[in-house]
Amino acid sequence: MDVRQSIHSAHAKTLDTQGLRNEFLVEKVFVADEYTMVYSHIDRIIVGGIMPVTKTVSVGGEVGKQLGVSYFLERRELGVINIGGAGTIAVDGQCYEIGHRDALYVGKGAKEVVFASIDTATPAKFYYNCAPAHTTYPTKKVTPDEVSPVTLGDNLTSNRRTINKYFVPDVLETCQLSMGLTELAPGNLWNTMPCHTHERRMEVYFYFNMDDDACVFHMMGQPQETRHIVMHNEQAVISPSWSIHSGVGTKAYTFIWGMVGENQVFDDMDHVAVKDLR
């Protein structure tokens, strides 16, 4: 488990390129037949990937000491979106088939969660966010047909994109975790511009669907102290509540956003005009 401490905005603005990457970038999300796990002190979110290839993968009691529990989801809820080939997730013996871009919410208290791929040639890639939970909500599968996609932006401003809200109150109940998937239309490069902050929630972006020769310049920092982190395919970045979170790519891309914090009101954000950015 990679533990990332919280960082003050006054400290963050003094960091160089490598310092910013060390604090906020999750460089390696998927490793064959393993799970990755980054624990952030910011709202206690856990971020990672699970890619079963030749065997099943599960998170066992080995994380208990670091989390202060006897099993992974004893006090946590889990959100998973599959960006790879078809797979399965077994939750306390109940098996769910999770295809490409299907998702699964797992409620607090699930003791055994086992991940598998159906075809080793095209393994599943389960990206997950995990957050502290105060009560148990039912485990539920969510498919792309259930997420009521919303298209925003314009080709003229190069930010035409479709937002798919997987884990939001209109779709299912969670304690605090919200997740979704945003896909840019071909030829469009910007996400979340004009940008915003939200003091009551932190957020993590996971960028994928990118060619090897492409990248995204992820914008972060306070609106008057902006910085950037160069992102490549299948990498994640942690965004504190004081930071903007936007990006521009060399080509179109897709990203998964996940939020935890004080509320789940999607529009509870503080907008920043482009003219006010520095």
Swiss-Prot record:
Organism: Escherichia coli O139:H28 (strain E24377A / ETEC)
Stored Gene3D superfamilies: Jelly Rolls, pectin degrading enzyme 5-keto 4- deoxyuronate isomerase, domain 1
Quaternary data: Homohexamer.
Region forming the signal peptide: none
Cofactor note: Binds 1 zinc ion per subunit.
Name of this protein: 4-deoxy-L-threo-5-hexosulose-uronate ketol-isomerase
Record GO biological process: D-galacturonate catabolic process; D-glucuronate catabolic process; pectin catabolic process
Function text: Catalyzes the isomerization of 5-dehydro-4-deoxy-D-glucuronate to 3-deoxy-D-glycero-2,5-hexodiulosonate.
Cofactor: Zn(2+)
Example GO molecular function: 4-deoxy-L-threo-5-hexosulose-uronate ketol-isomerase activity
EC category: isomerase
Gene this protein is translated from: kduI
